[in-house]
Regions:
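Noncatalytic modules at the cell exterior or secretory-pathway interfaces
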Residues: 31-39, 81-105, 390-395
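Charged catalytic cores and adjacent phosphate/nucleic-acid-binding surfaces used
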Residues: 136-146, 217-229, 259-408
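Surface-exposed beta-strand/loop patches in noncatalytic accessory domains
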Residues: 3-17, 40-77, 87, 121
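Short beta-strand elements
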Residues: 110-111, 125-130, 401-408
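A metal-dependent hydrolase metal-coordination microenvironment
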Residues: 137-269, 274-289, 304-310
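Solvent-exposed, flexible loop/coil segments flanking beta-strands in beta-rich domains
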Residues: 1-40, 112-118, 124, 141-144
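Exposed aromatic-hydrophobic patches
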Residues: 23-27, 79-81, 380-390
Length: 408
């Protein structure tokens, strides 16, 4: 019979003012083999985030995407880390994200078992097979420096490890079928997906960049690289310090995006800014550019689809972030990002603008206008055309003034 701990009460606006995160203790005896936690509340009226720490630290996060989770030595609900259940006091984290004026009642039940197999997560779907030969689009040949090539990718995607609908394998197969060379898997406030990435990447022939979208009510940031878990409860400057110290890169994600715009103060400046995101709904708007240039014109602009699920989102690679790399693999992509060898296009097969030495090269952009910080510079007449280089950000615009491609 599992050992059961129950907590119940009412979260109010006063609780949210006191702290965004609250902790409900669960005692885990030595020899425990399974933990299962369930949270009940009126989901039509409120949004409560769910996560967990053990005596040794972080064990998982699912935000508002799940009502329950389970952890066992050899398996865990996506978003959570399998492994030994350390004896001692565990803490279930409740994030108060959204409340009605009168608050919301909640009931939390935690079960702990010492019987192997009694409390286990639901089984995961069988992985899809790799794409058959010929179903993957051929690589796009863009002009690059000797020994390098431009890789097409997406720096912002989600899976079932947070609030996405696809497994890591399903996302990888889908992205490979779209012709992408790399994808950063950036699930919210968790790194439980990282352990899957190398094997899935090898199976589907795509580079999978470890990532975490550090997610708070004041803004989201993409921590890229094998940097471990970044504690979203700490100030944003600590995210930058931890990511850089561990060899990764931090991006301010969708800084102008409705209620998830960036409002967090920082002394430092992350090296990347997600200038192009699906929330750039009208590509004639210049607000994302204005924010980037006011925040830090030296930051490298990148793009991300923020992919979650088929049927409701633009597909991965919308926009496409191009990175000039000396090799395949996560380290090469990070090196290219760090060096600023980046360009963004609205889609993988769309117009691209590349900086090459003292030149700007427009590819597949006939009819577009090359525009610099001071205004229009030239009309593109040919499928591949070079122009004198110039300082500052450069864009390709269509005749309506919509951005087609962007580079620094």
């Amino acid at each position: 019979m599992p050992r059961t701990t129950r907590h119940h009460g009412r979260w109010t606006i006063a609780d949210r003012i006191a702290s965004a995160w609250h902790y409900l203790p669960v005692e885990v005896p030595a020899g425990s083999c399974g933990l299962r936690v369930g949270l009940e509340y009126d989901r039509s009226a409120a949004v409560l985030d769910l996560g967990c720490t053990g005596p040794a630290g972080f064990r998982g996060w699912s935000g508002g995407a799940r009502r329950s989770f389970a952890i066992a030595p050899d398996a865990a609900t996506p978003g959570y880390l399998p492994g030994e259940l350390e004896p001692g006091t565990w803490q279930v984290i409740i994030g108060i994200h959204q409340l009605p004026p009168g608050g919301v009642d909640y009931r939390l039940t935690a079960e702990v078992s010492s019987r192997p197999g009694e409390l286990r997560p639901e089984p995961v779907p069988a992985p899809p097979p790799p794409l058959p030969p010929g179903e993957r689009p051929p690589p796009r040949q863009l002009p690059a420096r000797p020994g390098r090539r431009w890789l097409a990718g997406d720096l912002h995607t989600h899976t079932v490890h947070s609030d996405g609908a696809q497994t890591v394998a399903e996302l990888s197969r889908f992205a490979a079928g779209l012709g992408l060379d790399f994808v950063a898997v950036t699930d919210h406030n968790t790194v439980s997906h990282h352990r899957e990435l190398p094997a899935v990447a090898a199976r589907h022939g795509i580079t999978l960049l470890p990532g975490q979208e550090v997610t708070t009510a004041g803004g989201h940031a993409g921590a890229l690289g094998e940097v471990g878990w970044i504690d979203f409860r700490l100030p944003a400057d600590s995210w930058l310090e931890q990511t850089q110290r561990r060899g990764g890169l931090l991006s301010v994600n969708h800084p102008i995006a409705g209620h998830v715009s960036w409002t967090l103060p920082m002394r430092g400046r992350p090296p990347l800014v997600e200038v192009w995101h699906w929330s750039w709904l009208d590509l004639r708007w210049t607000m994302p550019l204005a924010w980037w240039l006011a925040w830090d014109p030296g930051a490298v602009p990148v793009g991300g689809s923020d992919w979650h699920r088929p049927g409701s989102d633009a597909p991965p690679g919308t926009p496409t972030t191009w990175v000039e790399c000396a090799a395949d693999g996560p380290a090469a992509v990070l090196d290219g990002l760090r060096d600023g060898r980046v360009a963004i296009s609205g889609r993988r097969d769309g117009p691209v603008l590349l900086r090459s030495g003292d030149e700007m090269i427009a590819v597949d952009a006939e009819g577009a206008t090359l525009v610099g910080p001071d205004g229009p510079r030239a009309r593109v007449r040919r499928p591949r055309e070079s122009f004198p280089g110039a300082a500052g950000h450069q864009r390709l615009l269509d005749d309506t003034g919509a951005t087609l491609a962007l580079t620094r």
